């Protein structure tokens, strides 16, 4: 499975990336608000682009969203509407209304929205 990651967050580099690799999957794309800054070398050979370009990439099977909390719902909705299942850091939403909106989009898209919880 090929993952796209929204942003170059520390939790993504330290927790998600090793877990994805250990499971035999790969991160192929990192989306950034400003892709010109590049990403941490730990990602290896990944494509770096804007969030929108990353979400439009048909080669990505799923998206991980470790962005700041206020961006969890809007960016997860954008990923779902792009046809990608989403793993989102907690909290998935900042209100019940946001969560209801996200759940409705996930149901319409027939894609999974999953919250990441570290063990």
Descriptions of predicted regions:
Residues 8-12, 68-70, 93, 119:
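Short beta->alpha connector loops
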């Amino acid at each position: 499975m090929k993952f796209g990651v929204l942003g170059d967050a520390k939790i993504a580099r330290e927790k998600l990336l090793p877990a994805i690799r250990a499971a035999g999957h790969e991160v192929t794309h990192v989306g950034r608000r400003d892709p010109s800054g590049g990403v941490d070398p730990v990602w290896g050979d990944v494509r770096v682009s804007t969030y929108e370009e990353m979400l439009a990439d048909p080669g990505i099977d799923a998206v991980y969203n470790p962005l700041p909390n206020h961006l969890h719902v809007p960016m997860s909705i954008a990923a779902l509407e792009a046809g990608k299942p989403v793993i989102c850091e907690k909290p998935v939403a900042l209100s019940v209304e946001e969560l209801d909106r996200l759940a409705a989009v996930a149901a319409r898209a027939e894609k999974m929205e999953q919250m990441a919880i570290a063990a």
